[in-house]
Swiss-Prot record:
Changing C247S: Complete loss of interaction with UL11. Residues 9-19 have a biased composition (Pro residues). This is Cytoplasmic envelopment protein 2. The gene is UL16. Interacts with cytoplasmic envelopment protein 3 and with the capsid. It comes from Human herpesvirus 1 (strain 17).
Amino acid sequence: MAQLGPRRPLAPPGPPGTLPRPDSRAGARGTRDRVDDLGTDVDSIARIVNSVFVWRVVRADERLKIFRCLTVLTEPLCQVALPNPDPGRALFCEIFLYLTRPKALRLPPNTFFALFFFNRERRYCAIVHLRSVTHPLTPLLCTLTFARIRAATPPEETPDPTTEQLAEEPVVGELDGAYLVPAKTPPEPGACCALGPGAWWHLPSGQIYCWAMDSDLGSLCPPGSRARHLGWLLARITNHPGGCESCAPPPHIDSANALWLSSVVTESCPCVAPCLWAKMAQCTLAVQGDASLCPLLFGHPVDTVTLLQAPRRPCITDRLQEVVGGRCGADNIPPTSAGWRLCVFSSYISRLFATSCPTVARAVARASSSDPE
């Protein structure tokens, strides 16, 4: 078999079907000293690895290829991956993939011996038939489709992912371009779940729809701000002074570049929403934040903002007045639709957020499981 790199010891064997948790934990990076073999069924592994959004090349040569991905820790992944002990990374899963073609196995074309490592602690060994599609802008990113997976005998020694040198810079800027595309209300607008005020996941298409400013209105936002969607503006207007834990955006990764930190993804994510809406589903919100931003949405001063859609009965609409309204004393103040557009994200960008943001992933999973199709 081709060399797989530096080794580390395996965990001692346990009873069939058990997955003993290693006792030792090493370093702030959340790595452990031992690795356990998974007894998970092939179908479950196939669903998990084929759900990965993007794989990033760690290193590659004629004998060995190593890939890595980061993704939200979904319910299926919880069956094979232990949480990262770092609180800032506990909601995510890191997967390493080692691919070799040992001569002794006499594998047919496009077939590989694969080692999957989940959060560097559990591994699964398999023979896989592989199809790869490279990113149009860089050979360092690709999507991988695994077929005809069958469990394989683990090697006597295992490579150590902690020895790999990992890039810390993005290779593509997926959110740098014009990813907000003006749209009309889609078919079946009620087949959706709310991600934030004026932001929805459309179940039939698997795409995000959200209300956002155009570039002219966006130029009036505070310097350095990248966010343009309605939920972000409402949060700036209504969040209480000083903020709280709920006001801060949750941890995000950049699943398109396999990076643990990305301010671009965090700021642009449609999960950003007013604090009281996010933690209490409150739809009437006092203006406690930056009132100077109110003219971006209302033609007259307002002291209260009202979100007009109940979170449990969402419906995508291209009429802004069906999403948000304002009040000044006893007077109703409609929003100014000039400069605002209902936009749709491409399927690719939508999946980027669904695999980078735990809030979006959780909302989509919950809605998909209850969708009668």
